[in-house]
Amino acid sequence: MSASTSTSTAASQDACYISLLGLAEYFRTSQPPNIKKCIQCLQALFTFMPPSKVEARTHLQMGQILMAYTKNIDLARQHLEKAWSISEPLPNFDVKFDTASLLAQLHLQTDRNSHQAKAMLRRAVELSQNNVYWHCKLLLQLSQIHASDREYSLASELLAVGAESADEASATYLKVLFLLSRAMILMIERKTNDVLALLNSAGQIIDNNIPNPHQKEYLKVFFLVLQVCYYLALGQVKTVKPSLKQLQMSIQTIMAPNWPSDEAIFGANQLEMFVWLPKEQLYVLVYLVTVSHSMMAGYMDKAQKYTEKALTQIEKLKQQEDKPILSVFKVILLEHIVMCRMVMGNRELAIREIAAARDVCMAAPQRSLLRRHSAQLHCLIGLYSMSTNLFEHAERQFVVCVSETSERDLKLFANLNLAIIYLRTKRDTDLKQILDAVSTENTHTYSSQALMGGFYYVQGLHAFHKNSFHEAKRFLRETLKMANAEDLNRLTSCSLVLLSHVFLSIGNSKESMNMVTPAMQLASKIPDIHVQLWGSAILKDLHRMSKDVQHEKDAYANHVKYSENLIADQRKCVQSAHHELVNWFQGDPPVTSGPPAAPVLLMPESSVTASVPVIASTSAAMQPAGQYGQFY
């Protein structure tokens, strides 16, 4: 064959490839898309015996189309595996990296474990060292999988490698993304000092080395979210306020109508085409951390208001595109609002919203959300059972929670509630055992003001029940010191009302009144019906002792009102179909029918796909409440 004939044949083949690809794209983008004909066009390419690179790319495109538009996962896998086998040995050919990334996603969808996905990505990371964009993208994807599997050390190491690679390529924006992502992983591991060092380092780079003002503001939001979560994890509700205010201002800037689209900000340079979360999802996340702060500070009305706004925003985004991260946000928000309802005495609403959280978890593919949130659901049902005086059910729920979770704060929270159950049911041996265990495990290692304050509160409650009033005062003053330092209002109100009861028990009516008065003021601001019930009983006794008949009548009337509200709510609880959830101890939670959660929360308003995980989702606001010292 002559050279001219060969050239003519090649040109003719190229024209066929281009025509078939154009036709395939035409069918794909038709309204509605004609995927069958699109696939037939791509399939026809193989009849021309195309060169290796064209063949590999076509197999990749077939895999992409099949994954995106059909349920034929097996055929998609075959095409992607073929694309990988052809492209892997070819140098300077990016198709291998795109294929590896997609194959890893497919393995995660279909396999019971993530071994194959990790192996595929490790090989691709190894091959991509001369391609900074793909090297960093694959490192992020692999670290995400390790983080999802709770292999945090491996995830952290990969993110450190990514930061170095970005630094060597002078990709400052990308380097900061890696640093902040790693800080998030270290936060989950509770490596407090390392988190602080990384945040300080990233903060300085954001302030001094990011020339693009839009990218700078975006990174600032990421940085401030982590900083707020860092302080909240330490229970530092007062300390966090300036950072939270700054975060709220930054997100308003990003959400302004004149702010450029994410595509415009991150589309110019390949090494800047990385986004932690789109701005619409960041907006929801800022609501979420604001809810968490309001709960910990003891502002239930604020927490409810922001939860309603966040859930409305989630429903809007779900109508556009139902991203998995939105379900994660929804579950966390529901976990918060459930605790909020119980503090306010709305337990029937709480069990409805526990059922709503269950439904969101059950709807996620492969029960992935249920696996991650099962322990939290058991804990919430334990709190609900406690509040309805089902102590045996509550105990079993907390025991399941402790056995299922590896999160130290959730374990401590459940154990403190178990301690209160043992206290209320007079099981002194079990109580001593659990308090000793909590003390040994947490006193020197756990640094959350809220939870350690709660631990001292439980010890104070224990001392009070033993009539060791001096010891009770010592523990409760320690609790008050911690609560007042960080404006933990619920912890303060609970400690004050218990201290008031201590002073009443030893006949010191003046000090008792000095404690119960601010306790009731705080409880009405929160509002916390349990502290109000307890405080009104103490006030009734104090006014009776001082022969103040009118105030005694007023206090008694208030006590009756709070009591009747709780009794009426209790009746609604036991009549609710969702009440059956108290009997769920293993496996999938039962399906229960009943009224949905409050419409104002879940109806749309008339109103990752992140590179790294947003798993800093500990349900905060775990503080004591209730006449008998219940925690929420």
UniProtKB/Swiss-Prot annotation:
TPR repeats lie at residues 453-486, 493-526. Required for association of the cohesin complex with chromatin during interphase. Plays a role in sister chromatid cohesion and normal progression through prometaphase. Keywords: Cell cycle, Cell division, Chromosome partition, Mitosis, Nucleus, Repeat, TPR repeat. InterPro entries: MAU2, TPR-like_helical_dom_sf. It is found in: Nucleus, Nucleoplasm. Belongs to the SCC4/mau-2 family. GO terms for biological process: cell division; chromosome segregation; maintenance of mitotic sister chromatid cohesion. Gene3D superfamilies: Tetratricopeptide repeat domain. This is MAU2 chromatid cohesion factor homolog. It comes from the Eukaryota. One of its GO terms (cellular component) is nucleoplasm. The keyword Amino-acid biosynthesis does not apply. Interacts with Nipped-B to form the cohesin loading complex. Pfam families: Cohesin_load. The keyword Thylakoid does not apply.
